[in-house]
């Protein structure tokens, strides 16, 4: 029986994380969920937010993940998302600028795709939260 989970965080461009983990916490659409080894299999949607995991050396890791999906199996969790960034790779100034652009777009009310603007705002806010954690 495996003692750890294999965690894969994959975007269309690259594999961001491929590591063994003791525990993974992810931002599900119904709330944050945690996964340990031998978890019951399930598939769920993810919302933009923080993905935390503890590796086999007890080191904690933090990433921003965007919308996507997570497949949980007893010995692995695969996270498929549009984008993912490790905390240390987030450009805080760029995230702040994205938040300001999204807020201005929502406030203007002119020819605004509110769903897209709100999604952009949510992503920017979550990136800022992860960068500041």
From Swiss-Prot:
The keyword Transferase does not apply. InterPro entries: ATP_F1_dsu/esu_C_sf, ATP_synth_F1_dsu/esu, ATP_synth_F1_dsu/esu_N, ATP_synth_F1_esu_C, ATPsynth_dsu/esu_N. This is ATP synthase epsilon chain. One of its GO terms (molecular function) is ATP binding. F-type ATPases have 2 components, CF(1) - the catalytic core - and CF(0) - the membrane proton channel. CF(1) has five subunits: alpha(3), beta(3), gamma(1), delta(1), epsilon(1). CF(0) has three main subunits: a, b and c. Keywords: ATP synthesis, Cell inner membrane, Cell membrane, CF(1), Hydrogen ion transport, Ion transport, Membrane, Transport. Produces ATP from ADP in the presence of a proton gradient across the membrane. It is a peripheral membrane protein. One of its GO terms (cellular component) is proton-transporting ATP synthase complex. CDD domains: F1-ATPase_delta. It holds the Pfam family ATP-synt_DE_N. Belongs to the ATPase epsilon chain family. Its main location: membrane.
């Amino acid at each position: 029986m495996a003692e750890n989970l294999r965690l894969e965080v994959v975007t269309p461009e690259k594999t961001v994380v491929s590591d063994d983990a003791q525990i993974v916490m992810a931002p599900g659409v119904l709330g944050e969920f945690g996964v340990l080894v031998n978890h019951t299999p399930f598939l769920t949607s993810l919302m933009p937010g923080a993905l935390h995991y503890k590796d086999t050396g007890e080191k904690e890791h933090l990433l921003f993940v965007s919308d996507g999906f997570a497949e949980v199996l007893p010995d692995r969790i695969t996270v498929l998302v549009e984008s993912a960034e490790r905390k240390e790779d987030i450009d805080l100034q760029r995230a702040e600028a994205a938040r300001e652009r999204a807020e201005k777009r929502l406030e203007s009310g002119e020819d605004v795709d509110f769903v897209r603007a709100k999604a952009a705002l949510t992503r920017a806010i979550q990136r800022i939260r992860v960068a500041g954690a």
